[in-house]
Regions:
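Bacterial Sec-dependent N-terminal signal peptides
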Residues: 1-31, 39, 246-250
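Short loop/turn motifs that connect adjacent beta-strands in outer-membrane beta-barrel proteins
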Residues: 26-33, 72-79, 133-140, 206-211, ...
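Residues on the lipid-exposed face of transmembrane beta-strands in outer-membrane beta-barrel proteins
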Residues: 38-42, 63-71, 87, 124-132, ...
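Extracellular/periplasm-exposed beta-strand and loop segments of Gram-negative cell-envelope proteins
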Residues: 46-58, 90-121, 152-193, 224-241
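Transmembrane beta-barrel architecture of outer-membrane proteins
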Residues: 58-64, 78-80, 119-125, 140-142, ...
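Acidic/histidine-enriched, beta-strand-rich ligand/metal-binding domains
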Residues: 79, 88-92, 119-120, 130-142, ...
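Predominantly the C-terminal beta-signal and adjacent terminal strand-loop region
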Residues: 193, 201-261
Length: 261
């Protein structure tokens, strides 16, 4: 089912992009610019579990390759398609507290209990991008949005207490606030992730040097890392994350038009 959903999202997006660019070609100023480069940044993620698991933001790094094809300028909007192939470390970090909002102290270690799951993905977003401002020299503001797919490469756990000696959630109100702990021993069941991403950023362009971009990006996962049928423990287990990224692009091909600024 996941692969079918991925296919539907990708096909719908490609059809929309082709229709969009075709319509622009009839009324817009033609461009045929192609740029490549690399990106890197900081990513903050969590998982929307149902039933709920109290969490803090999981933090990690992301980086990879970026490709951009600029096709048109429609009135004042510069239109492009952007693709990336990224390596990203995401996951979840549990907020283990008592009902009084105090850290849960493990009886064996004497330390506040901590649990974190690191998940390493290859992420492939494809964006429709619109920018306003200078293309060759100066500043441009842009927005972009589109589907994103992810492929799980590996997972690892960070835990500072013996699992069989963990603090439970007791009926008298002591121990953990949440008794939901099934996820701590469950490996990821669905290796493919998919969803929708959108970003807002600013670009600085310099002739013969390239393009530098700063972007804030939000991602909402439409898939679940665990099964969500009636017999499964979780009804939902999808990603949300926020990334702050820097990107550098250099031009491979540029449209010959002295009017382009």
């Amino acid at each position: 089912m996941e692969l079918r959903a991925i296919g539907r999202i990708g096909l719908a997006f490609l059809i929309s992009c082709c229709s969009f660019l075709t319509s622009l070609a009839q009324v817009g100023e033609h461009r045929e610019d192609f740029a490549v480069g690399f990106n890197g940044g900081y990513i903050m993620s969590s998982l929307e579990f149902v039933p709920e698991v109290p969490q803090k933001l999981h933090t990690g790094l992301t980086g990879g390759l970026t490709f951009r094809f600029t096709s048109e300028k429609y009135f004042k909007s510069v239109c492009a398609i952007v693709g990336e192939i990224n390596y990203a470390k995401i996951g979840w970090k549990e907020d283990i507290q008592t009902p009084d909002d105090k850290p849960v102290i493990n009886a064996v270690t004497g330390l506040p209990e901590e649990y974190e799951r690191d998940l390493t993905y290859i992420q492939i977003p494809v964006f429709a991008r619109m920018g306003w401002g200078r293309e060759r020299k100066g500043v441009q503001v842009f927005v972009q949005a589109g589907p994103q797919m992810g492929i799980l490469l590996s997972e690892s756990t960070k835990m500072n207490f013996p699992w069989d000696q963990r603090t439970m959630s007791y009926t008298d109100g002591s121990g953990r606030t949440s008794g939901v702990m099934a996820q701590d021993t469950m490996a990821v069941e669905h290796k493919f992730d998919y969803g929708i991403a959108a970003g807002l950023g600013i670009e600085f362009s310099f002739p013969k040097v390239g393009h530098f971009m700063l972007e804030g990006r939000y991602y909402y996962g439409l898939g679940n890392i665990y099964g969500n049928s009636k017999r499964d423990f979780f009804a939902r287990s999808n990603f949300t994350n926020i990334a702050v990224k820097l990107t550098y692009l250099f031009d491979i091909k540029r449209t010959r038009n002295p009017k382009i600024k």
